[in-house]
């Protein structure tokens, strides 16, 4: 027969619970039979595993909160930088279009200037 990993995990937890109950019953028997030895028995807090009550957990939690805050701020800064890069790219495209349009206007003005110079040269040559 095969057991899934979930069955094995729940079986282990049940086994620990049973051992804890048996150990607690033994402690109660010792207390009722030998009250003098009750001082040597472990307290209930010593037998229950401390889940999340270790001395460094407060610092660790604070560290993770700080780390999360730093990561959030850095993510916001990255998004802001990407936004600025996109905006700058759009503005550069606008400037490039304007320069191209002005370049065409300048070329047209040069052609008109050349036509005027040719016409003036023709008029000057006719007068001479």
Curated annotation (Swiss-Prot):
List the protein's name.
Leucine-rich single-pass membrane protein 1
Q: Which organism is it from?
A: Mus musculus (Mouse)
PTM sites of type Phosphoserine: 24
- Membrane-protein topology: Single-pass membrane protein
Using the UniProt record, give the first listed, main subcellular location: membrane
The alphabetical list of record keywords is: Coiled coil, Membrane, Phosphoprotein, Transmembrane, Transmembrane helix
Which residues does UniProt call coiled coil? Answer: 90-111
The region annotated as signal peptide is none
GO cellular component annotations, sorted alphabetically? membrane
**Pfam families recorded:** DUF4577
Q: Is the Transmembrane keyword given for this protein? A: yes
Q: Which gene encodes it?
A: Lsmem1
Q: Where found, per UniProt?
A: Membrane
Transmembrane segment boundaries: 66-86
